[in-house]
Amino acid sequence: MQGPALRSPFRRWLPAIIALVVAVVAAGVLVLTSGESDDALVVYNGRSHYGGEEAFAAFTRETGIKVKLFGGDAQTLHDRLEGEGAKTKADLLVTVDGANLWRAKEEGLLMAIDSPTINEAIPAELRDADGMWTALSTRVRTPMRSTERVAADAVSSYEALGDPQWKRKLCLRSSTSIYNQSLVADLIAKRGATATETLLRTWMTNKPRILGNDIEVLNAINDGRCDVGLANHYYLVRQLSKNSSYRVAPAFPALSTAGVHANLSGAGVVSFTDRKAQAVKLLEFLVQREAQTAIAKQGEFPANPNVDPIKVVAAWGDVKLDPIDTEGAGKNATAAVKLMRKVGWN
């Protein structure tokens, strides 16, 4: 049965109501408490899957301090914070990619804090020397292999992906991926442009299949379209959680090498906040066991070395992390894109 027609006044305001709902959803606003939230700590959260925001909710339960999250991609939140300047409501910035943390520091968006709690919990290589930010988790961009067609020791370095035996059997994500751009920028910072170009050319000589995202790369290896590839490790965690028989495994660089490229998700106190003490308290909470355990559930490596990764990650054994050079990667971001184009990585 057809319901009664909408009354004219409601019909007149309906487009505005819909627009408002869409705007709220698009903004990614989440208040982790009931009641009024004007006094809530405001977090610009560019890492939206931290345990269903479990870590932030746990902070509210423990301290009584309310938290309001504004989600979005890292670039959008950075631009928003930069545009708002001193008028921003943000107290804490959570973002992805070490280069983004460096840029936020360089542009004066973060303030220095001196926290013995953070310094004790997080290794020096995973936090800013000036106290502007700290890592909350790390993710590695590692070679991947077929467990059916590739021996465990056949790929033990990034150089191994350029071995001629992988010609037309290598899968890579597009060069437009920020993950690939950050990897290359970090390689330039640590190895130099010439050595990095040589490495990338060996990959391109193998006529790699270029795909749209990391899941496509992993599926291509699983399905037999490729034998080896490159992907962030937590995407494999997700696939294995759906299918324990998934025929892909990480091929971490050998412990004798520099290690596997480890990028960061991290956070810093916004330089314009008038709630520094509460923001620091939240940041300190995020590096402790309860919050780090919640973050680790998403498959990333917790930044606090006293917190174990989840079982599927721990089962992979010892992994030597090579943390991103945040300043070097930030300064070489443009050079990385140009180099990838130069060698024909589309």
Regions found by a protein language model. Give the residues of each.
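A ligand-binding cleft/hinge motif common to bilobed small-molecule-binding domains
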Residues: A99-R103, N222, D227-V248
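Periplasmic-binding protein-like
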Residues: R139, R168-S175, L199-M204, I210-L211, S245-S271, F285-P309
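Early extracytoplasmic/lumenal segment of secretory-pathway proteins
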Residues: P15, V29-W102, N346
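Extracytoplasmic ligand-binding site segments that recognize negatively charged/polar headgroups
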Residues: G46-E53, G72-T76, T88-C226
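An extracytoplasmic/periplasmic, membrane-proximal ligand-sensing/linker region
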Residues: T194-T196, A303-N346
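A bilobed periplasmic-binding-protein/Venus flytrap-type ligand-binding module shared by bacterial periplasmic
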Residues: M144-R149, A262-R275, A294-I295
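Short, low-complexity disordered leader/linker segments with a strong preference
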Residues: M1-A40
